Amino acid sequence: MDQISAILPIKTRGRHYADNIGRCDILFSSLRHFTTPDTFHRIVLVVPHEEVEEVKGYAKAWADFPIVVIDESLHMGIFAEFSQRHQIRNWHRQQIIKLNAPEWIETEYFIVFDPDCFATHPFTAQTLVPGGRALTHRGARNLHPDIWQASAKLLNVDPGLDLDGLWWTPTMLSRTLCLKLHERLAQIHGTDWRRVLLANYAVDWTEYTLYWLNACEQGLVDQYHTWAQPGQRTLHAAESVWFANEMKEWNAAQHFAENSDGLFAVVQSNTRIPLEQVVETLSPYFPIRIQPYERHFDAALKGAELYSAIARRGLKLLNKMRGRVTA
């Protein structure tokens, strides 16, 4: 495997997104240090229409990589069908964008990035696709049973909670398996796969649980995915920072050490850990360049997003009581 692609949805406005450009600077600084631009055939940045020109300007700092900035509105017009505030779930919309990657990439395998992840060890395309299959990180399904059960309902399959599943971003996916998921959702529900997912905005499906359950159901996991073998690093470090109180105890030196496991780690953006603290923690291990950027804070938008979250919680509880999936 000579090259892979990458997809990275970016927002700069909203509750958790004000420092996403700075976080992307960290991500690309790590990629610059631990791999080369030639690893990637294309890195697709998918951006809301109103943020496209701004992100294009910031993306010049990453122009040594094969960056393509995509206007979300030109490809995701279906989002407009779900425009009521409680229907707008940015987390789900970004997951749909990730599953839509086959529209924008040509390679069989691609890595999914979020702005808050970064590399911790050297890698190439061959590292991520050993023997022609995607390097995959295990995670027990029963750690998060709700998301596996929600996705299983949409696919009419058993959630298999006693089995391992696919772990979080960054994750390697197959273009072919994404397309097969699109086909299966459309076949079951009789409409565009994206509409199926958008209509179920109050259900906690996720892109990876849907992808993995469908691949398992079709018996295709072993054809397209592989686990790390002895002597190979896993995709994820042994620990990432998922909650703010974990940052103090997170041992960066350990996770960047030559004898440590894992190619990537995460300092989750919704922890509200200051960007400066993240840079201070990581900069001893790779050079980081943070460009000047504007932090957008909109109190009205924040209030609207909070209302949306509260409304969805109520709908989710109601749907759970009814056992409902929307076609």
Predicted segments with their positions:
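Membrane-proximal basic amphipathic "stem/tether" segments
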Residues: 1-2, 268, 273-327
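N-proximal low-complexity "stem/linker" segments adjacent to membrane-targeting elements
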Residues: 1-29
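Short, acidic, metal-binding catalytic loop of nucleotide-sugar glycosyltransferases
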Residues: 29-39
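Short beta-strand/loop segment that forms part of the nucleotide-sugar
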Residues: 39-50, 69-74
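Active-site-proximal specificity loops/subdomain of glycosyltransferases
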Residues: 58-103
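Short aromatic/hydrophobic "clamp" motif used to bind/position activated sugar donors
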Residues: 110
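Catalytic core and acceptor-binding pocket of nucleotide-sugar-dependent glycosyltransferases
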Residues: 161-254
